[in-house]
Amino acid sequence: MTNISKNAVTKPDWLRVKAPQVERIGNTANLLSDLKLNTVCQEASCPNIGECFASGTATFLIMGPGCTRACPYCDIDFDRSKRDLDPTEPDRLAEAVFRLKLKHVVITSVNRDDLDDGGASQFYKCVSEVRKKSPETTIELLIPDLCGNWSALEKILDSRPNVLNHNIETVSALYRKVRPQGNYQRTLELLKRTREYFPSVYTKSGFMLGLGEKDDEVLTLLMDLRKNDVDIVTIGQYLSPGPKHLQVQRFVTPSKFNYFKLFGENELGFMQVVSSPLTRSSYHAEEIQKLMKKFPR
């Protein structure tokens, strides 16, 4: 297995982000605060929060903000206590989508291993409420692995999202270090089962570079995703949230990111590979509407 050391490396210039437009960030943040909604943009310290909030978009984080898993790369708070789901959350989320006039919305969640269905029913309710208030809005769900509960997966898919995203996060060799409660093969199976159960959905997955992976392992990962019917892939640079988290092993150059993009699209036939240092799984997710027109189902 590839070793992951604790030594940090210097951040390069290409990871610098332009200063955000404070006023427009404030408008989006205030709306989310008024409706008592969480976003992964805030909870996971996403580097693109300025750009996304300034454009009036956000990735909603439901059933949180605490997560029942403590992955060493993630900045979301760990909370293993049993918590009741908020029955008003789906309606509040739908209201935010309506007021922000979103053409495309991304809904994700923390892991809720304390729930029998992993939160599948809450995903279903959120999609249903958004459809009622914003019927023209396309919906992308970024879901956890549900501990391999395939009936829960089917419950989520019964809500008929346009896109089902589940991130594989890293190469197989690093899984036990990076996602100790996850499973590489289970993630691939979830993605494959998604297309088998709901053939018209667009499937998506993403992963990070800079954790100690080798280039040939990245190519294998891309091939594994394609073999399991994934349509869209996102690849971004891992940035350590703090000293207690896994540290960056390398900063991958923009040209290397582009190499993986070209390999995925030209050699493997993905619909789209979004690959750059600042790419995150929901970054520019609204562009899925263009893909849906280009590759109709």
Curated annotation (Swiss-Prot):
It comes from the Bacteria. InterPro entries: Aldolase_TIM, Elp3/MiaA/NifB-like_rSAM, Lipoyl_synth, rSAM. Residues 53-271 form the Radical SAM core domain. It catalyses: [[Fe-S] cluster scaffold protein carrying a second [4Fe-4S](2+) cluster] + N(6)-octanoyl-L-lysyl-[protein] + 2 oxidized [2Fe-2S]-[ferredoxin] + 2 S-adenosyl-L-methionine + 4 H(+) = [[Fe-S] cluster scaffold protein] + N(6)-[(R)-dihydrolipoyl]-L-lysyl-[protein] + 4 Fe(3+) + 2 hydrogen sulfide + 2 5'-deoxyadenosine + 2 L-methionine + 2 reduced [2Fe-2S]-[ferredoxin]. [4Fe-4S] cluster 2 binds at C67, C71, C74. Pfam families: Radical_SAM. PROSITE patterns: RADICAL_SAM (PS51918). Its EC number is 2.8.1.8. Its cofactor is [4Fe-4S] cluster. [4Fe-4S] cluster 1 binds at C41, C46, C52, S282. SMART domains: Elp3. It is an enzyme of class 2 (transferase). It is found in: Cytoplasm. Belongs to the radical SAM superfamily. Lipoyl synthase family. Keywords: 4Fe-4S, Cytoplasm, Iron, Iron-sulfur, Metal-binding, S-adenosyl-L-methionine, Transferase. GO terms for molecular function: 4 iron, 4 sulfur cluster binding; lipoate synthase activity; metal ion binding. Signal peptide: none annotated. One of its GO terms (cellular component) is cytoplasm. PANTHER family: LIPOYL SYNTHASE, LIPOYL SYNTHASE, MITOCHONDRIAL. Its main location: cytoplasm. Binds 2 [4Fe-4S] clusters per subunit. One cluster is coordinated with 3 cysteines and an exchangeable S-adenosyl-L-methionine. It comes from Prochlorococcus marinus subsp. pastoris (strain CCMP1986 / NIES-2087 / MED4). Pathway: Protein modification; protein lipoylation via endogenous pathway; protein N(6)-(lipoyl)lysine from octanoyl-[acyl-carrier-protein]: step 2/2. This is Lipoyl synthase 1.
